[in-house]
Design a protein with these regions (language model features):
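N-terminal secretory signal peptides that target proteins for export/translocation
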Residues: 1-21
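Sec/Tat signal peptide C-region and signal peptidase I cleavage site
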Residues: 41-46
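Catalytic glycan-binding domains that act on GlcNAc-containing polysaccharides
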Residues: 66-297, 310-313, 321-339, 343-361, ...
Length: 420
């Protein structure tokens, strides 16, 4: 198994709550683990029950080394967070097409702001790049994606949000308990004051949205002041992000991937396969405008995020490292593209085919059910389009003379629903 395949496997398995931004995962990842009826108790009864839970949680925090005074300050006046309860029970059926996602995530405004941040923090970013071996543009791109360069870091008190999840969630309680304890230990150590410990409804914090456990493992005290302050100290936050990427295997001096052009008659059975770039070149895969690949020996995976009619990409290991930050392909592609644009690059060469609409989760379940009925075994109909579903789609596409790109589109569902 090559190193890149190991990273792809790790990224594919990284479908639980991530290291820093649980609120940015597809919400199904949370709602599968969390269901709570806000109307089950009256507000007064819920608060009373929650207060008992807080007192009952104290021994857990104490045994982890949290001081009693810190615990009291952290929970002073805290009640269950209704926004957290509402959001953790919400499951969006709508799926934004990747071209709409990218248009927002890599907007001209965000690109220009990223270039400004690259200039404003040039000395610090140069030092961070030297220390961790991670491209400064990639670090700035994640900052832009996560909080729009610090303009919105979330408005939830992290202890309140995590306590609500630890109290209300019927599953994954150990996860939420650990995150809450770690947040309390951060307060106890004086890295941030309670009134500044704000983040997402799921507890992701700071400029680049670390979960408390990830803060504990990867945060960096860039300026040596004794605090790892990802909330108000921008260099600390950027260094922490670089450290996270480095620790997950970032390859220094290499890019995340390349937009590529596929030749006429290309064998789409090779989609999702890993080969050296030299091997892809022998199959006729090239870069737009005749540009060369700088390192033909690099391993790369061919992906088609919107099928054969949209842009194609060869993804290198750093792409899968970005996916350890957020496991969505669209997110990692946006980070890579934003980094390139901030560096001075242009938009993608090929336009997106806006007719190639993606499926909602319920539509994906329908497609999986129909494929299974037709004998194209894709496993459980869970609405998640993974490797097994793409293999089944390709087998169906081959059987009816379509390009076997494995893309789960509305048009494909309509065709198979009609019995064709």
């Amino acid at each position: 198994m090559t190193v890149l395949r190991i990273f792809r496997k790790a990224a594919a398995a990284f479908s639980g709550l991530p290291r820093r931004s649980a609120g940015r995962l597809p919400l199904a990842a949370l709602t599968a683990a969390v269901t709570f009826s806000a109307g089950a108790l009256s507000p007064a009864a819920a608060d009373t029950d929650f207060n008992r839970w807080v007192e009952g949680f104290w021994p857990v925090a104490r045994d982890a080394g949290v001081g009693r005074d810190t615990y009291r300050r952290a929970f002073q006046g805290v009640t269950p967070d209704p926004d957290t309860i509402r959001l953790m029970n919400k499951q969006s059926e709508f799926v934004k097409p990747i071209w709409e996602y990218l248009a927002s995530a890599v907007s001209d405004t965000r690109v220009e702001k990223g270039r400004e941040m690259l200039s404003a923090y040039a000395p610090q970013l140069a030092a961070i790049e030297q220390r961790y071996g991670v491209d400064r543009e990639a670090v700035v791109a994640i900052w832009g994606m996560e909080t729009n360069y610090g303009s919105f870091m979330g408005e939830h008190y992290v202890v309140r949000a995590l306590a609500t999840l630890a109290y209300a969630a019927p599953r994954r309680k150990d996860f939420w308990n650990r995150e809450l304890v770690t947040a309390l230990k951060i307060l106890d150590a004086g890295h941030v004051q309670p009134d500044r410990m704000e983040g997402s409804w799921a507890g992701a914090m700071g400029h680049t949205q670390f979960m408390p456990s990830s803060w504990s493992q990867y945060s960096s005290d860039y300026d040596g002041d004794g605090r790892r302050d990802i909330w108000t100290n921008i260099p600390d936050a950027l260094a922490s992000t670089a450290n996270y990427l480095k620790r997950h295997g970032w390859q220094s001096g290499k890019t995340w991937g390349y937009e590529v052009v596929l030749p006429r008659g290309f064998d789409y059975e090779a989609v999702d396969e890993e080969k050296t770039i030299a091997a892809w070149s022998r199959l006729g895969v090239s870069r737009p405008n005749g540009r060369n690949f700088p390192r033909p020996s690099d391993d790369a995976v061919l992906i088609l995020p919107a099928g054969a009619s949209g842009p194609a990409f060869l993804m290198l290991r750093n792409f899968y490292v970005i996916k350890r930050y957020n496991n969505a392909t669209a997110y990692a592609l946006a980070v890579g593209h934003l980094a390139d644009r901030v560096r001075g690059g242009g938009p993608f060469a090929q336009d997106w085919d806006k007719r190639a609409l993606p499926l909602t989760r319920s539509q994906a379940e329908d497609l999986q059910t129909l494929l299974n009925r037709r004998g194209f075994n894709v496993g459980a109909a869970d609405g998640r389009v993974g490797p097994a579903t793409r293999r089944g789609i390709r087998a169906y596409q081959r059987s009816v003379g379509l390009i076997p790109d494995g893309y789960a589109s509305v048009a494909l569902l309509e065709r198979i629903s009609a019995g064709r």
